[in-house]
């Protein structure tokens, strides 16, 4: 079985440094943070959260899961991510998503939600150029500039790894054209293998070498000895986060039950091709640290 990397989501905005240190001490390969400008409750900003985590750690990689790419101008995001990569001594991974499930945040940012895909594709082109070239000129639909050099450029060469999130075919094509990895969420093992094949086909059609492409997975976990309690907590946490009823579908999209149950379910994803597993916590707030420990010590070693 191929080795799998594991990441832990930083769940609280108030104890980021402590949680990041804990994840690093438990052997996680990544800590990760997502973002929204607004959502169904309080939500972080990915880059600020990861900057705090960077200052509290020395080894663990820092992944955005994800930055909402179309809500940034490419120059601003290129600058922020480059500085974060330099400040963290080359540990940043940029996961991007196009969003759209909460249109109000697009309205508030003055970005037409229907442009999110085209804006994201162009932004990826611009950011990669700014990360890797000097005296850059670009003329596109949304960005136009001449003679721009980003300083500093990222520590990682040729640039920080790019991960594309999303379940639609357009996201798979975006991953094939621009990214180093793919991170779907709310996905089943049955869907996974075929999607990886589709990404590689898109890459082949574009003439892009994807031999080092990394299929990832963003998944929720609720680890309790009692399987019913674990499922109930997963449904409650996901329902609160996404403002919908997860009572009948939490089991499809979360690892839940005791560590053995979680290993069994995760193996289905790994057998389907997942090689980087990023775990977010769908449990009681007071149980997050214990869940993080159980996944690190009793689930992850089976796939290392």
State each model region's role.
Residues 168-173:
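Short, glycine/polar-rich helix-capping loops at beta-to-alpha or helix-loop-helix junctions
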Residues 2-11, 71-137, 185-186, 190-194, ...:
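Flexible, glycine-rich active-site loops centered on histidine and acidic residues
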Residues 1-26, 93, 111-114, 128, ...:
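C-terminal amphipathic alpha-helical "assembly" element
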Residues 61-74:
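Structural motif corresponding to the early beta-alpha repeats
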């Amino acid at each position: 079985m191929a080795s799998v990397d594991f990441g832990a989501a930083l769940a609280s905005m108030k104890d980021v440094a402590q949680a990041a240190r804990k994840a690093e001490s438990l052997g996680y390969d990544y800590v990760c943070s997502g973002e929204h400008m607004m959502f169904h409750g309080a939500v972080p900003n990915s880059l600020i959260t990861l900057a705090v985590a960077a200052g509290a750690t020395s080894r663990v990689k820092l992944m955005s899961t994800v930055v909402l790419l179309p809500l940034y101008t490419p120059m601003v995001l290129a600058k922020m991510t480059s500085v974060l990569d330099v400040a963290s001594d080359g540990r940043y991974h940029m996961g991007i998503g196009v969003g759209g499930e909460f249109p109000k945040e697009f309205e508030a940012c003055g970005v037409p939600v229907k442009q999110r895909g085209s804006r994201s594709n162009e932004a990826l082109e611009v950011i990669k150029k700014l990360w890797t070239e000097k005296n850059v000129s670009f003329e596109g639909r949304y960005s136009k500039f001449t003679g721009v050099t980003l300083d500093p450029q990222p520590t990682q060469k040729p640039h920080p790894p790019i991960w594309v999130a999303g379940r639609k075919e357009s996201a798979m094509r975006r991953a094939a054209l621009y990214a180093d990895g793919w991170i779907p969420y709310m996905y089943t093992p049955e869907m996974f293998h075929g999607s990886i094949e589709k990404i590689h086909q898109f890459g082949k059609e574009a003439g892009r070498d994807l031999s080092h492409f990394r299929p990832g997975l963003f998944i929720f976990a609720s680890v309790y000895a009692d399987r019913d309690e674990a499922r109930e907590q997963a449904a409650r946490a996901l329902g609160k986060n996404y403002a919908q009823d997860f009572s009948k579908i939490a089991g499809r999209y979360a690892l839940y039950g005791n560590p053995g149950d979680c290993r069994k379910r995760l193996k289905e994803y790994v057998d389907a091709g997942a090689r980087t597993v990023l775990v977010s916590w769908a449990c009681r707030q007071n149980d997050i640290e214990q869940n993080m420990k159980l996944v690190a010590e009793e689930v992850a070693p089976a796939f290392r």
